[in-house]
């Protein structure tokens, strides 16, 4: 999705440059000014949507960030870790440690979900619980946690769908406006001319389909002329 959004953003920017170039010669054109404003808005919307594409687990783990691990962990230890689905801290157990990459495979006690998380993000159980109490979070039952997760996922999905819908609508609106702009530009530059296919039906019974370019449409075909006098034999010496 990020790649598609990046392509769309490049397209919007290219369109904006062309509109700005057109405005340099007609700075008071209301249609062009409105188109410029709309393009600027959709560019900002696309940038905003692109900024949400990277993993959101980075922001959720900010409260656990540090430069070096403050605890020596081993397999089987209990810890407090951030669940990537909602950014909340839960009790978990360390299943495996990768010292080379500084990560640990953990299993959350409440849901049984397994994740791989940086060792820097892990906290001792007591320290993690105290941090939650200090922040005003009261312990919840398993049922309450499940209900909270469902509500969070629902809101997140709705918000994402709405953002995508708004962006797609902006794209369609810009497509129509851009086509209208191009059509008006053609009409102004080609005033009095009619865009016709060379294969269009002739306007008279003597016209020929496919014959009519260069201003000779609907005229009778050129009559055949005898060119035998120019035969190469007449040029040979007698």
From Swiss-Prot:
GO MF annotations in UniProt: RNA binding
Q: What is its main location?
A: nucleus
Sequence motif: Nuclear localization signal, positions: 142-160
Localization? Nucleus speckle; Nucleus, Cajal body
Reproduce the free-text note on domains from the UniProt record: The Tudor domain mediates association with dimethylarginines, which are common in snRNP proteins.
Q: How does it assemble?
A: Associates with spliceosomes. Associates with U4/U5/U6 tri-snRNP and with U2 snRNP.
Protein name, per record: Survival of motor neuron-related-splicing factor 30
Q: What is the lineage of its organism?
A: Eukaryota, Metazoa, Chordata, Craniata, Vertebrata
